[in-house]
């Protein structure tokens, strides 16, 4: 990990393949220029005084500074993970390859089982580098909302719509980012659905989701 580019960022959100009890993340640095910056960003700008000290507690236990990255100041914050979260992550890291293999296998089986449904278009990737964090389908003929509504009301399955383009949010529109012209993004977002696909789901639950989607699509 971390060999692509100078800095690699990993999310450990609860819905990711590897999690740290809800929230968390990791930064991996592959460039010595940034090694001292990351710890400062993580913990409120804490750093050493940069001088030899006869007494380790004087003038204080630690210094504070604003991290600099390529000549630009970056305001730090408290992004530290707790000990329990780190302990869990350390154990899950040993299993993440197995988890990814399981996710890929489930995703390919799911996609292939619905391949005859012309209303649904999946992005099927055979590469072992694709971990299927999300299982997403694009729905044709404007049937997306009808499918989501029927799955939720009749089967208790809540699909999601992810992720709202930033330029559609009123907040970003209010600060001048609402004029973006992204027709492909709009087309995809307005016709996509994200299928429940957490690693914690059992094989039976995954099969129920798949069969329910088939029933709904074939009824349209």
Per-range role (PLM):
Residues 1-4, 27, 177-180:
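Short, hinge-like loop/turn segments at secondary-structure boundaries
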Residues 2, 10-11, 25-30, 60:
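Short beta-strand-to-turn element immediately C-terminal to the catalytic PLP-Schiff-base lysine
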Residues 22-23, 84:
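A conserved catalytic-core signature of glycosyltransferases
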Residues 30-220:
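PLP-dependent aminotransferase class I/II
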Residues 1-21, 36, 68-71:
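Conserved active-site segment immediately N-terminal to the catalytic lysine
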Residues 16, 25, 42-45:
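Short, well-ordered alpha-helical segments in soluble proteins
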């Amino acid at each position: 990990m971390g060999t692509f580019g100078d800095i690699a960022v990993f999310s450990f959100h609860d819905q990711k393949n590897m999690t740290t009890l809800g929230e968390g993340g990791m930064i991996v640095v592959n460039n010595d220029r940034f090694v001292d910056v990351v710890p400062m960003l993580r913990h409120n700008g804490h750093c050493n005084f940069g001088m030899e000290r006869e007494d380790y507690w004087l003038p204080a236990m630690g210094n504070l500074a604003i991290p600099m990255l390529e000549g630009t100041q970056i305001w730090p914050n408290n992004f530290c993970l707790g000990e329990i979260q780190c302990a869990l992550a350390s154990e899950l890291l040993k299993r993440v390859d197995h988890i990814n293999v399981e996710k890929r296998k489930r995703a390919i089986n799911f996609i292939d089982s619905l391949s005859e449904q012309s209303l649904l278009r999946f992005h099927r990737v055979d590469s072992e580098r694709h971990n299927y964090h999300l299982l997403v389908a694009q729905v044709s003929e404007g049937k997306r909302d009808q499918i989501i509504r029927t799955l939720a009301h009749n089967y208790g399955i809540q699909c999601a719509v992810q992720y709202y383009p930033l330029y559609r949010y009123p907040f970003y529109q209010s600060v001048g980012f609402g004029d973006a012209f992204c027709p492909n993004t709009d087309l995809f977002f307005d016709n996509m659905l994200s299928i429940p696909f957490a690693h914690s789901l059992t094989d039976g639950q995954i099969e129920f989701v798949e069969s329910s989607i088939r029933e709904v699509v074939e009824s349209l």
